[in-house]
């Protein structure tokens, strides 16, 4: 169902652009200059909020520095709101940047999930449970870091 909704809106612009225009209802949590936050309609837990830029772009790199800064200000404000309501200072914050990363709606969005004791949420490792963890290969990590430092 969720993927079907996202695909339906791709031909008309993104689902989130339609939300921003008021064409699709949302459950607003907060908004500010350059960002809008609303409850995810398929929450992973109570309070699961999406923070989006008001300009429709698919990838973080397409936002200007000011837009990225504004988006993170929105994330921080949402954390404050959710933290007060759920009595927590702990959050899972996640961005799926592109379809291979799991992005279902082609509009940048930041997931903000309040975390509380016993919520059964997992760590990053729980996202790839079949991937074995091994001892760090510092030689390979060092080589990759050197390559990445020279990347454009």
What do these predicted regions represent?
Residues 2-152:
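HIT superfamily nucleotide-processing domains
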């Amino acid at each position: 169902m969720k993927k079907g909704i996202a695909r339906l809106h791709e031909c008309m612009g993104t689902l989130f652009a339609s939300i921003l225009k008021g064409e699709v209802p949302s459950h607003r949590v907060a908004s500010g200059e350059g960002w809008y936050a609303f409850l995810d309609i398929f929450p992973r837990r109570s309070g699961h909020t999406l923070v989006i830029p008001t300009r429709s772009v698919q990838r973080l790199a397409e936002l200007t520095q000011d837009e990225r800064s504004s988006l993170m200000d929105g994330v921080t404000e949402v954390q404050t709101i959710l933290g007060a309501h759920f009595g927590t200072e702990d959050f899972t914050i996640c961005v799926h940047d592109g379809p291979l990363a799991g992005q279902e709606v082609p509009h940048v969005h930041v997931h903000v999930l309040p975390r509380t004791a016993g919520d059964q949420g997992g760590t990053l490792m729980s996202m790839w449970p079949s991937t074995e963890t091994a001892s760090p290969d510092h030689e390979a990590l060092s080589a990759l870091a050197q390559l990445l430092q020279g990347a454009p």
